[in-house]
Regions:
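Accessory RNA-recognition modules of RNA-modification enzymes
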Residues: 2-253
């Protein structure tokens, strides 16, 4: 006879799971015969058919095959790439419930984990929960015979090539588009994770809410950066906002 919390699922098999909670990083939590199963993109109130992809001693992870009953927290993401892109974890959850989840997460971190008995005041939400992210990091790669730049696909290192992100500050979107086009025009070679060739690993862009100044950081494999001066000159012309440009060397293989 299985004891509560003992393994009752098998890798590769599909189970009907009612989602009752969420982890700190936004994965749904359900149980199969009292054995915890974490399900990415699932929300409390969902009932899903999910295929188990890994089994540990005290929990398993599964991916949604089909949503049988939709949670009242679930919405259709506005972004058409949300299904694949790893840039947003809760694009499928309505904003009111996002705030409630974050509120509870802070309360649990302080009261249950930190043993600090204190009252957490309600989170002050935004009137429009878009355009607020003032720092983004974009991996750079090569696909379909061209340089690509965007966000890693969920659970992979495949890059979702994009030109716009709704939650980023508009100036980051503008700078992002300019940087990608200039890198393509100058034929700067992206870093290749397989053979460790190429130069550009990531581009980090940050904007100040105070004066709208931009900071652009090129994370490179080596100090040698072909077309570096040309790149800076082109960006200076493309971006009228005050901008600073840095190079961060990461030679780690």
């Amino acid at each position: 006879m299985k004891q509560p919390g003992q393994q009752t699922v098998n890798k590769g098999e599909t189970y009907q799971i009612e989602i009752t909670d969420m982890t700190h990083d936004g994965e749904g939590v359900g149980r199969v015969d009292d054995f915890a199963v974490f399900v990415p993109e699932a929300l409390p109130g969902d009932v899903v058919l999910a295929r188990v992809i890994s089994v540990k001693k005290t929990y398993a992870r599964a991916l949604i095959e089909k949503i049988l009953t939709k949670s009242n927290q679930r919405i259709t993401p506005v972004c058409q790439k949300a299904e694949w892109c790893g840039g947003c974890q809760l694009a499928h959850m309505d904003y009111k419930h996002q705030l409630a989840w974050k509120q509870r997460y802070v309360e649990e971190a302080l009261n249950r984990l930190g043993k600090i008995e204190t009252k957490v005041l309600p989170i002050i939400g935004m009137e429009n929960p878009e355009g607020y992210r003032n720092k983004s990091q974009f991996p750079v790669g090569f696909a379909d015979s061209k340089l690509v730049m965007g966000f890693f696909q969920k659970r992979s290192h495949q890059i979702v090539d994009t030109d716009h992100c709704r939650i980023q500050h508009p100036l980051i979107n503008k700078a992002f588009q300019s940087v990608k086009q200039v890198l393509r025009d100058l034929r700067v070679e992206p870093y290749n994770e397989i053979n460790h060739s190429g130069v550009i690993r990531h581009v980090v862009i940050r904007v100040s809410f105070c004066n709208h100044a931009l900071m652009i950081v090129f994370v490179t494999r080596t100090d040698d950066f072909p077309h570096r001066d040309e790149l800076i000159t082109c960006l200076t012309k493309e971006l009228p906002e005050p901008a600073s440009v840095y190079q961060n060397i990461n030679s780690k293989v």
